[in-house]
Amino acid sequence: MINNLSILIPTYNNVCLELVKDLQVQASLLSDFSYEILVADDGSTDKMTVKENLAINDLENCRYIEREKNEGRAVIRNFLAKEAKYEWLLFIDSNMNVINSQHLRNYQMTEECGVIYGGYQVKRNQESLKHNLRYIFECKGIQNGDYKLRQANPYGDFHTSNFIIKRSIMLQYPLDERFRYYGYEDVLFGKTLKENHINISHIDNPLGYNHFIGNMTFVTKTEESLRTLYQFRDELQGYSKIITYASKIERWHLKTICQKLFPVLSLPIKARLTGNNPSIFLFNIYKLMYYIHLNTIYGVTNM
């Protein structure tokens, strides 16, 4: 049973006041339970967002921390872990929402484990989002809210949001701060936990995810994450299907063909992905070709 908790929310250009209010209400109603909610702003450039989030400081046991410089997902999470005062940490992304009034109680009553992951859930069949690539991508994939599927691959299906971890473990094995740009810091963290024999318990306690950026932005963020993957490809071997498929293409002596095709096919595929009829099949093809294309730019050395 978990009776103390530091709820840690990193944010960047996102208003998360309602999320904090929902969590604060739940925490305040739990018996024999000590808590704090820390929100760390990673150098937001949207001043109106910062202004709205300042109201978090008016809530009991809540604190909004402004940081001047954007330092990335790994640094901000490690910072929050150091700022926290309780034995247990709950990390939540600021663009998630509470969908269960017993969310914190479920964690409180869970059997203790080094890491506990609750997953996330996307509401399906939203007509207004049928042209949104990120939404389609989430719906086509394995639903992260299904804890039984996640438990079958406990380290591979782990994300650094909506998870509880002992503070001592987080401080001993912090996120790798070389990850300055978007993507894959959670994958390497899962690998670190596995290598150090730290168990992850997957439970049915999802948060909602309903923040679906536009198609162009999503493709751009995907490209950024693939550059991160390429940079850390040696350490992420065995933890990325893209690396696995790219290695097979190289063994089949098809890499040069893919590199030559990318300049020809990338623009029409990207136009389809950013339009009103995006295709997950083409999205997967684009990701693989873009990753292989990075070898043309950077060669055998890291970025």
Which residue ranges define each predicted feature?
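Acidic donor-binding segment of Leloir-type glycosyltransferases
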Residues: L23-E66
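Glycine-rich, basic loop-to-helix element that forms the pyrophosphate-binding segment
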Residues: R67-A84
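Short aromatic/hydrophobic "clamp" motif used to bind/position activated sugar donors
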Residues: L89
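Conserved donor NDP-sugar-binding/catalytic core segment of glycosyltransferases
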Residues: S101-N132
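Short, flexible, basic/aromatic active-site loop/helix in glycosyltransferases
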Residues: G119, Y135-Y155
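Acidic donor-binding loop at a coil-to-helix junction in glycosyltransferase catalytic cores
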Residues: Y181-F189
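Active-site donor/metal-binding and catalytic loop motifs
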Residues: N196-R233
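Non-catalytic, C-terminal membrane-associated alpha-helical segments of glycosyltransferases
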Residues: E224-R227, K241-M303
